[in-house]
């Protein structure tokens, strides 16, 4: 009888096997043998296979104080309408306590907790590494926290203190120097929503001009913080006339483009645009999808699949008499529609795409 040893498995076959291991099981797999650990920690392996599982991608969902790793399949449900498996499902819990917000950048998660306002936690679930960041002063959950990196891939954290506490300040933490600095510069704008995300190392916000605040509302713009120059860029145009009475949500497309969803609060019509060019000082847009959607998406999240021409929305459904349920909706052209109930919750689900990486913290 001939027995094949684990060490006899070809490199290609080993990569194929390990690429299918759930991220929540990686710690146990790495402890099996040195060869597996070295491969899983190889940046080229995580870049090649990270987040790609048979047309699926990974996402982090936070709701209340829980953070979960989700698998989202935008291809199967539309290709086979009789498919019973949901297009989104939980594949694991992330072991950080009392998470209020998660900000994703380059495979790292910046975690803001509910209870402890004396530290931030930077976490790489793929490598099972964490770093606690002590502030100059206390953190507050209603401030803005952003993770990014400069042109040399040096990671940094930006904290924008909320004006509701009587101060508008900016602080930046460098992983390289392990220290904070206070940034000071005049601005003619104000960040208007709890909407910010990372793209190519920089962070994008929604903002308005201070002098344009009126009773009828104010026009909003896109605003970029450049982590290389450690400065905000100019106000950039959105692809529509957007005022504060409008539901507006940002998302990324394959870590290369920015997408924006717009829905007026007094109408069902919902539109999505995708950038054709995105830089700290310039942006251009292309129309992507239009559909009618009755549910309020304020505070929610969404993803798009350009090839399938579909959007996946995550928001609270308040139609039930008892309790509030989180729901996911897949909507496409020609009236395509599918929904999945994610369970009862008093918190709107916040979703961000997640691609494992070997960035050290």
Curated annotation (Swiss-Prot):
InterPro entries: F-box-assoc_dom_typ1, F-box-assoc_interact_dom, F-box-like_dom_sf, F-box_dom, SCF_F-box_component. It comes from the Eukaryota. SMART domains: FBOX (SM00256). Residues 3-49 form the F-box domain. This is Putative F-box protein At3g19560.
